[in-house]
Amino acid sequence: MDPINQRIGDMLARIRATRPLIHHITNLVVMNDTANVTLHVGGLPVMAHDAEEVAEMVAHAGALVLNVGTLSPDWIESMLIAGRRANELQTPVVLDPVGAGATQLRTRTNLELLRSLRIAVVRGNGGEIGALSGEGGEVKGVESVSGPEDPLTAARRLAQTYHTVVALTGARDIITDGERVLTVNNGHIWLTTLTGTGCMATTMVAAFAAVERDYLLAAAGGLAMFGLAAELAAEKAHGPASFKVALFDQIYNLTPEQVANGARVVEGGS
Amino acid sequence: MDPINQRIGDMLARIRATRPLIHHITNLVVMNDTANVTLHVGGLPVMAHDAEEVAEMVAHAGALVLNVGTLSPDWIESMLIAGRRANELQTPVVLDPVGAGATQLRTRTNLELLRSLRIAVVRGNGGEIGALSGEGGEVKGVESVSGPEDPLTAARRLAQTYHTVVALTGARDIITDGERVLTVNNGHIWLTTLTGTGCMATTMVAAFAAVERDYLLAAAGGLAMFGLAAELAAEKAHGPASFKVALFDQIYNLTPEQVANGARVVEGGS
Amino acid sequence: MDPINQRIGDMLARIRATRPLIHHITNLVVMNDTANVTLHVGGLPVMAHDAEEVAEMVAHAGALVLNVGTLSPDWIESMLIAGRRANELQTPVVLDPVGAGATQLRTRTNLELLRSLRIAVVRGNGGEIGALSGEGGEVKGVESVSGPEDPLTAARRLAQTYHTVVALTGARDIITDGERVLTVNNGHIWLTTLTGTGCMATTMVAAFAAVERDYLLAAAGGLAMFGLAAELAAEKAHGPASFKVALFDQIYNLTPEQVANGARVVEGGS
């Protein structure tokens, strides 16, 4: 077995064994879904956003998710407080820049988070990563209408600028720390028919980052498992909602062995 | 084929072809569901409520949904900002007056929105439309306990007062611009067993209004398709939750031809 | 038939006959789920949190749920306003102390609610009840990592201190008013794989409390029915999400007779 696959399977086993708390400060649309995804992959979810408690809460967490999908000023403040505390504790922070590029508020806020915090992984679609990297792309609401012309270059530039790992998800997922590149070929077109699948992918990345300090590999692991679950779920789908039920069931049912066998991760961005 | 049916099928085809952005400022209970309904019918959803970004966001939208289901003052302010910008751009605004009649805050806020903005369509249940029209009816929480004695008169009066289209949904849906009247006979009793089906219907209306300037017909189209999906979903339901899965699958799977064939829309309010 | 079972079946029949409004001031994660559970058991849900309307809304309610899962200061203020009005009207208030013990804000807020209001039932997991009673236990995020050494003593102490009924849910549910004790043996391990099942249980308790002034028995009834629905749903589950669909369907489909027959409630805490 490819050593990457073996390591991805091992990460899932560690999530299931240690049940890391994944603290989310996330948007109002996906809270229920991402809490369930956290539980199904093996972690413990908590959604807490008040400035008074986020620093205390994140101190118990294995990873922190910052997701700006339904932004408001007081939540941004809480994200900064929680993020700084996570940085002090070396707890990985995973950023989902939902809708970056769609409005100035979203673009500016994401750049502020990237500048103010040490972000372990940024997980976004082509339009969002394009907007943040300055390499172009278009976002309509929260959907990527078009990505940057060269996604890998955009991801690499963003990763280098902010010393982070960038995971640009789409038909194929590109992950880079600015030098190394991994490509994840798992996934299914049904994922585009549901709201919040990007946010769910981010939660998967956070769960893996909670148990693996090589964040490039952690991101690949989370995305490969999510994509694999989607592939298997598609066999039972009659539409987006039955696909979602099957997807969540699969995330719960997949074993470390199945994930190690089914992950399709390759080195390089070709 | 009835020309109305043909036009309804054509509208769905246009939604699928143009994927209009449907900007929602909506309640916390239904955000996920209405985002998914938007995607399944063929549009792109975005939920954005911060005063700083709503005017910018709505400028890219094909329609704006204002839904007061879980009201708070800062969201009302955002609704007014987004609504005014939508009015400037001639983008249709669809209002869902959730719980109008249940509390003074809800009744007053909905009337303020109706007075301050040019609303394309108001979609509410009998109790809500009754309360806003002054024709009576009772709302308990967000449910219509009893509608106005004469629903058509209530709908007509509200439509005339605010120069809008009123869609009063129930066992049969009545839609009027104050003069013309359409009745939609699609639907299923299972819809009453789920939370948020009124809000979902509003989202359907908004998606159709994004591609059709005859808002009376657009409202009929959205409601007919929603009701038709419910009829087909009921065949697979073992209870409300399996009904919901089937309903969402159906909204996604229905083709323009099926909707044109299955819509049961008649002129007049008899 | 055991008289307790008969009374539980009768309560469900009363819920279905009178459709009490269950006013929730609850967390952002579970709003949709608990609204649906309210409808499926037979009540009418409303989620309303603005300080300006909560007193008016709760005046029409059969029960008030206060759930602190995603806390912020303005919501706490609304909880106090609604709770005081409910107390004046003798409307039962059911508290779900989500995450008590996890942060100081959560522990302090729950104790403040317990001191300021007359709470009919507190429904929490072992860690939460342990933290509030001072009897120990550990909460990680919102999950009970470990309960108090002697759950019954913790529940009893909390009940006595605040003159309330405490329902400590887990593999077996312990319910006490400080003197009398009931144990509910219904339930299923699948409930631990889904987010918000504690909150759903609280909603069930509130629906039963809306029609039964013996809150000890009402809590047992709500929890027994919820657990029974879970047992039946487990037969159709392929994972947590299909379990959830089946659970919600079952809550809707269960008849008073089935609940009277299937409830496994015993007196005492052994």
Swiss-Prot record, chains A, B, C:
Named cofactor requirement(s): Mg(2+)
Record pathway: Cofactor biosynthesis; thiamine diphosphate biosynthesis; 4-methyl-5-(2-phosphoethyl)-thiazole from 5-(2-hydroxyethyl)-4-methylthiazole: step 1/1
Residues where ATP binds: R123, T169
Keyword Transferase set for record: yes
Binding site for substrate: M47, G196
Record-linked Pfam families: HK
InterPro entries attached to this UniProt entry: Hyethyz_kinase, Ribokinase-like
Protein name: Hydroxyethylthiazole kinase
